């Protein structure tokens, strides 16, 4: 998920980072046969890719519940959809060296809190959706509308099964193994490409498995620094992870989530599966493929070079260190592991505010905030203190902005009140002739809520039995008084759409009746094909789509003229009862005491408890940064609160001793029990299900049927905080250990840690040597280290894996029915590939945040006009924040200053404001304006000339005082830094 709305922010602020993907067209022969493009030809996007990495969860989710077509009815159909989706990505990217497929395995405990919240919300939404469907069926029956009972009884697919340890994930792993083998055997384009599969049995989040692999390759002396990487995924944090690699040839591939094909709002008929007989286009309707886009990290680096540059520093400016700092302070705005600081909202310009504070503070901090994933807490306190000084003003301004939005909304509501009150029923005007008993239907041209697609001229058709809309609404209103769930549905709808509860109920009933009437007008036949998933609108109604899992689906029980439900915040109607009163009132004096009392249950006379929350949050910041830059520092650490402290309370941070114990990840079943609600119990073995449902279970309190969602000042439920109890690890492990002996062999196997697999075709240059060495009698099962010419640029250890060997038959693990699928995914009679157990090499040294020697930087893309635009926005941001209580006021680029180049140990010079290595430096294309005249001085890539120590005896990361950060491992490994120092005479930086 990452930082909510980050992708949208970057695509708007730095427009050129986004470019469309060019896909080679499929050639069609006269007989209708389609010929796929030749993928061995140069990539039409103009850039060749060496390594492609697939964050597979970003493929499974859109394939399991697509937006542009009916959802697959079986898991086998889902697997075929996954194959086809992956084929499309391969055709776009055309990797020449490696394809790395990573599926989310067991996540660190810090991530499980977010996963638990998301899955409980999903279960709650499904229950409300089912309740609403039953209400619709009841209303339809009262109107005499026959409903297909088989369709209404269809069980919805539980997306919570996309979690390690479930039978679905086991099927996915088997299917992908077959997919890879099939590719290597049937498609000559991929015979020289190596495939690596890290499935859900291998612990770790998919994107972090990918980053661990990239880091492991970078540290090898033989690694090619000009390797071109592409990562596919929908999580916004892939952008930050891409920056954290310091690989300039790096792109992120993703669907264009903002692409809209026509109207984004489905009609009632479409959502309920009602087919119009007069709409012949429906049968020929072909879904339009959603386009893909590149996010170019190299161009983002260009933008950040301008955005983050600070003149007149007492130490040399280092772009790599500045980027690391930028990645770090964006964590304050929110991430998957910590709640965002109360005063920092990305939609309120928090990123720009933090950037401005950082630029103003950097000259006075003595150095950068971070070093290779470790935080200097004393300097971090400078930034947080500056934010804290602004908190009062921020909260007041947010309240003023909200009041203005509400007032503007009320004015619009007043102007449109007549049209709004008529709502959906005005779309259809019925005139019934007493003499002819026929009806004339006229469709209003003003309607925007429903696409009725009327005939070209008015028609007369036989009238159905009359429908009493008024009586229906009265009956429903009376009946809903005692229906708790139904009332909840209407209340939720009213809260989202800015309607009163009464208006929502009446509107829902009126439109239900109108929809039923229209269906009768079209046909008196039985309504068919009303699946549970499509019966009531369900969409990802969130403000910014940064991840396929970034929000909970929101049920829409009523139709309205508001088409962008959940995308644009709506002010409440003046008549609405405010059920979610903001009792904290951050904009009024005394908010600090109210906030801690209500959110943390801490009274004003307990400052030590606030300090404890601050310590936990600081640990969280250090944990997240290490996770991004070095790998998981602790599998068991987590932030034990639902909310973050105020920035003003982050004081004396240098005295906080930050240490982590690595420990071990959960087993898959332990994670399932930690994140799934009881409604998803079927994803677990039957013996373990009792822990979630038996009232005598020792952990039954982990699975509440009802829980509170605190809107926390927001408008929509998905923005709120799910107040679920935190899992007690010891109680969970103790309970599950008693049941493990009762599991079957197959069930126990799904709970075991698996291995990463490497697949190679017989035609690959390294195949023969690998087989010769691995299967020799001398080897006797020992792993083989890939190095030298045999490695062909891939480093790690491999060992035999007898599950896939050459010259044997391989069966497709899924049942395919379509002729096309049968042709593509049949049995492989004579396998010509091999799979090996692959071990990602473990480094005993800290991964350095630096460009590698010998890298050739991409050509610059930004023009002087682009750079001036960034400058102008910086200047505007500075003026807007001028006068706030942090040092520096506002800055501009209009200062003539010598910008020093960087000198690496190779004696090559990297010109500071350019992104290119060259002997003697490369003059930046926009330096002619005099702002950045080049200097002949050179300095070390580390910017602050820090010294780097070797292994620490204590086994830990350490910046030394004042930060005092440590990283320790119960496995006895650890690495340390010496204290940061600035030394004008030190040019190499390493000693």
Swiss-Prot record:
UniProt main location, coarse: nucleus
InterPro entries: 5_3_exoribonuclease (IPR027073), Xrn1_helical (IPR041412), Xrn1_N (IPR004859), Xrn2/3/4 (IPR017151)
Residue ranges with Low complexity bias: 433-452, 878-889, 896-910
Subcellular locations according to the entry: Nucleus
Protein name: 5'-3' exoribonuclease 2
Physiological role: Possesses 5'->3' exoribonuclease activity. Required for the processing of nuclear mRNA and rRNA precursors. May promote the termination of transcription by RNA polymerase II. Essential for vegetative cell growth and chromosome segregation.
Annotated Gene Ontology cellular component terms: Las1 complex; nucleus
MF terms in GO: 5'-3' RNA exonuclease activity; RNA binding
The entry's keywords: Exonuclease, Hydrolase, mRNA processing, Nuclease, Nucleus, rRNA processing, Transcription, Transcription regulation, Transcription termination
Native source organism of the sequence: Schizosaccharomyces pombe (strain 972 / ATCC 24843)
EC class (word): hydrolase
Entry similarity comment: Belongs to the 5'-3' exonuclease family. XRN2/RAT1 subfamily.
Assembly with partners or alone: Interacts with din1/rai1; the interaction is direct, stabilizes dhp1 protein structure and may stimulate its exoribonuclease activity. The interaction also stimulates din1 pyrophosphohydrolase activity, probably by recruiting it to mRNA substrates.
Positions with biased composition (Polar residues): 926-938, 980-991
UniProt motif (Nuclear localization signal) ranges: 264-268
Amino acid composition bias (Gly residues), ranges on this chain: 946-958
Gene that encodes it: dhp1
Presence of the UniProt keyword Membrane in the record: no
Pfam name, any one: XRN_M
Region ranges (Disordered): 404-461, 547-582, 872-991
EC number: 3.1.13.-
Extent of Basic and acidic residues compositional bias: 404-418
GO biological process: cleavage in ITS2 between 5.8S rRNA and LSU-rRNA of tricistronic rRNA transcript (SSU-rRNA, 5.8S rRNA, LSU-rRNA); DNA-templated transcription termination; mRNA processing; nuclear mRNA surveillance; nuclear-transcribed mRNA catabolic process; positive regulation of chromosome segregation; rapid tRNA decay
CDD domains given in the database record: PIN_XRN1-2-like
């Amino acid at each position: 998920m990452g930082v909510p709305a980050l992708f949208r922010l970057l695509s708007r602020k730095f427009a050129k980072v986004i470019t469309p993907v060019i896909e080679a067209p499929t050639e069609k022969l006269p007989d209708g046969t389609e010929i796929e493009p030749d993928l061995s030809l140069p990539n039409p996007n103009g850039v060749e890719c060496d390594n492609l990495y697939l964050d597979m969860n970003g493929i499974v989710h859109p394939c399991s519940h697509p937006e542009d077509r009916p959802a697959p009815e079986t898991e086998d159909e889902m697997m075929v959809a996954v194959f086809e989706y992956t084929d499309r990505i391969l055709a776009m990217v055309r990797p020449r060296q490696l394809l790395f497929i990573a599926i989310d395995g067991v996540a660190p405990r810090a991530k499980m809190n977010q996963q638990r919240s998301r899955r409980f919300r999903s279960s709650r939404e499904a229950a409300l959706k089912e309740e609403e469907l039953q209400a619709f069926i009841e209303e339809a029956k009262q109107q005499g509308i026959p409903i297909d009972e088989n369709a209404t009884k269809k069980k919805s697919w539980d997306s919570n099964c996309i979690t390690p340890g479930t039978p679905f994930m086991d099927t996915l792993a088997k299917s992908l193994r077959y997919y890879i083998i099939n590719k290597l055997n049937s498609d000559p384009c991929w015979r020289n490409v190596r495939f690596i599969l890290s499935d859900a049995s291998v612990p770790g989040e998919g994107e972090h498995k990918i980053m661990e692999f990239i880091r492991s390759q970078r540290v090898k002396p033989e690694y090619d620094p000009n390797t071109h990487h592409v990562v596919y995924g929908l999580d916004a944090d892939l952008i930050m992870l891409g920056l954290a690699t310091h690989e300039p040839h790096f792109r992120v591939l993703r669907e264009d989530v903002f692409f809209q094909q026509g109207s984004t709002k489905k009609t009632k008929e479409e959502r309920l599966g009602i087919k119009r007989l007069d709409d012949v286009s429906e049968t020929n309707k072909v879904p339009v493929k959603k386009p893909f886009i590149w996010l170019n990290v190299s161009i983002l680096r260009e933008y950040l070079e301008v955005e983050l540059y600070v003149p007149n520093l007492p130490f040399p400016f280092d772009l790599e260190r500045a980027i690391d700092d930028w990645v770090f302070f964006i964590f304050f705005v929110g991430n998957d592991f910590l709640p965002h600081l109360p005063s920092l909202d990305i939609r309120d310009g928090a990123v720009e505010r933090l950037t401005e504070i950082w630029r103003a503070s950097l000259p006075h901090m003595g150095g950068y905030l971070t070093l290779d994933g470790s935080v200097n807490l004393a300097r971090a306190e400078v930034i947080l203190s500056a934010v804290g000084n602004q908190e009062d003003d921020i909260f007041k301004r947010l309240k003023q902005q909200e009041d203005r939005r509400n007032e503007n909304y009320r004015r619009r509501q007043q102007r449109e009140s007549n049209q709004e009150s008529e709502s959906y029923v005005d779309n259809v005007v019925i005139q019934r002739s007493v003499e002819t008993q026929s009806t004339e239907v006229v469709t209003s041209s003003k309607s925007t809520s429903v696409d009725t697609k009327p005939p070209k001229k008015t028609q007369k058709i036989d009238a159905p039995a009359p429908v009493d809309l008024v009586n229906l609404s009265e009956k429903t209103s009376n009946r809903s008084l005692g229906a708790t769930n139904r009332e909840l549905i209407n209340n939720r709808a009213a809260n989202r759409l800015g309607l009163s509860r009464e208006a929502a109920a009446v509107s829902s009933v009126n439109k239900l009746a109108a929809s039923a009437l229209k269906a009768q007008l079209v046909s008196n036949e039985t309504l068919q094909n009303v699946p549970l998933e499509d019966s009531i609108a369900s969409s990802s109604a969130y403000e910014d789509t940064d991840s396929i899992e970034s929000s909970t689906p929101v049920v829409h029980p009523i139709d309205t003229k508001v088409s962008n439900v959940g995308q644009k915040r709506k002010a409440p109607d003046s008549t609405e009862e405010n059920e979610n009163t903001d009792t904290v009132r951050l904009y009024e004096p005394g908010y600090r005491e109210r906030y801690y009392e209500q959110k943390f249950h801490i009274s004003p006379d307990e400052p030590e408890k606030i300090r404890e929350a601050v310590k936990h949050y600081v640990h969280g910041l250090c944990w997240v940064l290490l996770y991004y830059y070095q790998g998981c520092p602790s599998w068991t650490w987590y932030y034990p609160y639902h909310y973050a402290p105020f920035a003003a309370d982050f004081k004396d941070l240098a005295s906080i001793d930050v240490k982590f114990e690595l420990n071990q990840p959960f087993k898959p079943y332990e994670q399932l029990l930690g994140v799934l609600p009881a409604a998803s119990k079927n994803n677990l073995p039957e013996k373990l299900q009792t822990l979630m449902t038996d009232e005598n279970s020792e952990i039954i309190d982990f699975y509440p049927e009802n829980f509170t969602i605190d809107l926390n000042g927001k408008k929509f439920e998905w923005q709120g905080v799910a107040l679920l109890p935190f899992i007690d690890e010891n109680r969970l492990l103790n309970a599950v250990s008693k049941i493990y002996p009762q599991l079957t062999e197959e069930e126990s196997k799904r709970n075991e840690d698996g291995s990463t697999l490497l697949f190679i075709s017989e035609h690959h240059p390294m195949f023969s040597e690998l087989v010769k060495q691995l299967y020799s009698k001398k080897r006797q099962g020992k792993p083989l280290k890939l190095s030298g010419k045999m490695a062909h640029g891939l480093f790690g250890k491999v060992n035999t894996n007898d599950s896939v060997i050459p010259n044997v038959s391989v069966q497709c693990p899924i049942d395919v029915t379509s002729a096309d699928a049968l042709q593509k995914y049949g049995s492989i009679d004579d396998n010509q590939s091999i799979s090996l157990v692959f071990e990602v090499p473990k480094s005993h040294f800290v991964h350095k945040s630096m460009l590698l020697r010998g890298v050739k930087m991409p050509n610059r893309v930004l023009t002087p006009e682009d750079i001036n635009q960034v400058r102008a926005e910086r200047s505007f941001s500075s003026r807007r924040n001028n006068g706030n209580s942090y040092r520096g006021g506002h800055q501009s680029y209009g200062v003539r200053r010598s910008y020093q180049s960087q000198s690496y140990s190779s004696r090559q010079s990297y010109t500071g404001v350019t992104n290119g290595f060259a002997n003697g430096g490369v003059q930046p294309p926009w330096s002619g304006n005099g702002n950045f005249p080049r200097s002949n001085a050179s300095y070390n890539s580390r910017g602050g000339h820090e010294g780097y120590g070797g292994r620490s005896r204590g086994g830990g990361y350490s910046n030394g005082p004042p930060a005092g950060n440590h990283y320790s491992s119960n496995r006895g490994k650890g690495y340390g830094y010496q204290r940061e120092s600035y030394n004008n005479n030190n040019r190499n930086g390493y000693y």
